[in-house]
Amino acid sequence: MGQAYDALPSEVYKDGELKGKIKRLMGLAAALTHGCRACILFQTEEALKLGASVDEVLETCAVAISIGGTMAAGETTRVVQFLGEKGLV
């Protein structure tokens, strides 16, 4: 059971009908609406590694804000700060 659980992320986020990049952006939107700080940074980093542009990341943040309201808006500042630290904005 433990091995199957450990393998889950690599299976879920690999390219399928949806590209891994899109899945990571979806994960970012979910993390923003749930306020999971570590997840927000992790999903942002992984999406960038898979070729997401800064504009795609920020558009994902906008979608999350439309769903999660002020909580997602507040958490979006973490993404902007992270992108700034990477010299991307």
PLM-predicted stretches and their roles:
Residues P9-S10, G27, T44-L48, A62:
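Amphipathic alpha-helical segments within well-ordered protein domains
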Residues E17-H34, D55-T60:
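Immediate flanking context of iron-sulfur cluster ligation sites
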Residues L32, V63-T70:
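A short structural micro-motif
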Residues C36-C39:
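Short cysteine clusters
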